[in-house]
């Protein structure tokens, strides 16, 4: 935090001066403000990440590695922990992933199945959507899964969390834009390795906003293009390469969001338990449900999901209204609501200011209980989602077995359903 304070020293704009401005504001003036803000953002990022500039993954203690990789719940994992417990050395992300993959075979993707695609979505901003996508990617990778993270938000917040400056380091070929424009039919070449072992990234930048114009224009072409299936079709190779695909979506019902929802096997909807967020979430589901009224969406039997999870985020136990709103959410969404919750914590904003998450902390400088509370919450969410992934793979296998045994009764399954 001190590095951030130093970064803005001498660059503050007087609030009094700003308040005294009179007269019209030209586009040139807006452009100069944008340039100033962009320069300051670059300076802050450079200071926070100096001297390496690039983010580095943390190292964990043996106890942390066991807890975050799910090894503590497996007999073989417990043996691994016992074998390493006497060693007072750091465990890398790669080592934790390798141990999880070897010692948790029941949770790994069957070779005959494709990746589970998860869209993290909410039409309202500020609900913890990007942080949820990032921590899911990190948490699932620590469980031994190979993860592809896709940033579909032109703001590029997920890209920034991976330590990449969207405005200057991202090219079109690193985004989903060429796919959505029809310049290619495979998103896999856009994926790039990241600082976090086991997680690759398809980045985003403001240029991705052009997709909001390109997608509907493709629908007017006479080639039978379905605008809501562009991303789904482009993920075929990625589904054979990765175990799970996590998509961060824009906070709006945009063409990009629709493509993410139509490509997904499962959806995670983060929401704080406040009255305003509850009302906004109701609109989300209503608009989402309106898809069923579109005859074109229903071709092939309709879209189906393996799981949908509503995740309570930024849960403030000191908020007297919170229990009531939590009750509303449980009453409205029932089995969709995850038992795990993300508490409001001083850790999350501190890490966000440093362009990171709770998983990026190897050693926490503050109260140990504070860190344990937030990291254990994210780990519990990861466990819930992983169980849903495993169940989806098993259900799909049973469905395929039934279709093989009774081919005449199987019908024609929608290509968008869980793979």
Q: Which residues does each predicted region cover?
A:
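P-loop NTP-binding core
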Residues: 1-63, 74-79, 83-419
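The alpha-helix within a helix-turn-helix
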Residues: 66
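Core residues of bacterial helix-turn-helix
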Residues: 69-70
């Amino acid at each position: 935090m001190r590095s951030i304070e130093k970064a803005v020293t001498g660059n503050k704009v007087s609030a009094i001066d700003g308040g005294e401005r009179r007269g019209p504001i030209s586009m040139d003036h807006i452009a100069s403000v944008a340039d100033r803000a962009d320069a300051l953002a670059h300076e802050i990022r450079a200071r926070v990440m100096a001297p390496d500039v690039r983010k580095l993954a943390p190292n964990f203690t043996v106890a942390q590695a066991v807890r975050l990789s799910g090894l503590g719940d497996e007999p073989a994992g417990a043996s691994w922990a016992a074998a390493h417990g006497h060693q007072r050395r750091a465990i890398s992300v790669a080592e934790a992933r390798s141990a999880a993959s070897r010692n948790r075979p029941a949770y790994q993707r069957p070779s005959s199945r494709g990746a589970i695609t998860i869209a993290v979505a909410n039409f309202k901003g500020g609900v913890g959507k990007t942080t949820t996508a990032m921590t899911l990617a990190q948490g699932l990778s620590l469980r031994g899964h190979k993860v592809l993270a896709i940033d579909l938000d032109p703001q590029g917040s997920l890209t920034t969390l991976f330590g990449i400056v969207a405005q200057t380091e991202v090219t079109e070929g690193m985004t989903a834009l060429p796919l959505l424009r029809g310049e290619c039919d495979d998103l896999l070449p856009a994926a790039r390795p990241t600082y976090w072992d086991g997680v690759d990234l398809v980045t985003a930048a403001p240029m991705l906003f052009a997709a909001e114009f390109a997608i509907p224009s493709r629908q007017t072409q006479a080639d039978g293009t379905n605008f809501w299936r562009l991303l789904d079709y482009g993920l075929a190779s990625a589904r054979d390469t990765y175990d799970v695909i996590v998509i961060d979506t824009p906070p709006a019902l945009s063409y990009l969001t629709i493509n993410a929802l139509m490509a997904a096997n499962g959806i995670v909807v983060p929401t704080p338990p406040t009255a305003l967020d509850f009302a906004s979430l109701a609109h989300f589901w209503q608009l989402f449900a309106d898809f069923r009224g579109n005859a074109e969406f229903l071709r092939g039997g309709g879209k189906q999901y393996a799981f949908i999870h509503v995740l309570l985020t930024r849960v403030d136990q000191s908020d007297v209204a919170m229990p009531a709103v939590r009750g509303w959410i449980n009453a409205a969404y029932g089995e969709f609501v995850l038992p795990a919750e993300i508490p409001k914590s001083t850790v999350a904003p501190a890490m966000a200011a440093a362009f990171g998450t709770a998983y990026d902390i190897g050693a926490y400088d503050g109260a140990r209980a504070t860190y344990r509370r937030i990291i254990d919450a994210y780990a519990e969410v990861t466990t819930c989602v992983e169980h849903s992934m495993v169940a989806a793979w098993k259900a799909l296998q049973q469905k395929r077995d039934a279709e093989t045994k009774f081919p005449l009764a199987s019908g024609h399954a929608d290509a968008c359903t869980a793979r």
